[in-house]
From Swiss-Prot:
The keyword Hydrolase does not apply. Coiled coil: none annotated. One of its GO terms (cellular component) is extracellular region. Keywords: Bromination, Cleavage on pair of basic residues, Disulfide bond, Secreted, Signal, Toxin. Belongs to the E superfamily. It comes from the Eukaryota. This is Conotoxin Mr22.1. The modification 6'-bromotryptophan is found at residue 75. Residues 1-18 form the signal peptide. Contains 4 disulfide bonds.
Length: 90
């Protein structure tokens, strides 16, 4: 019974709030930033505020695809720089 209640509450939350996002507690980033890690290569995101590097994230990703997918990202922010997988691949 409790399992059914848990799943019902989880899916209700998913419908109203959206699926839970992945966050890195050590980093300061825009809301709802989502990180998807794959294999093969590395990529990352760096954030600079007032000329200082606050956060550097790296993860593995599939060739040719971005590691970082997001919703409601402030792309106009001058301090945000997104790196996709490096080329050429080895």
């Amino acid at each position: 019974m409790m399992t059914r209640v848990f799943f019902a509450m989880f899916f209700l939350m998913a419908l109203t709030e959206g699926w839970p996002r992945l966050y890195d507690s050590d980093c300061v980033r825009g809301r709802n930033m989502h990180i998807t890690c794959f294999k093969d290569q590395t990529c990352g995101l760096t954030v600079k505020r007032n000329g200082r590097l606050n956060c550097s994230l790296t993860c593995s990703c599939r060739r040719g695809e971005s590691c970082l997918h997001g919703e409601y990202i402030d792309w106009d922010s001058r301090g945000l720089k997104v790196h996709i997988c490096p080329k050429p691949w080895f």
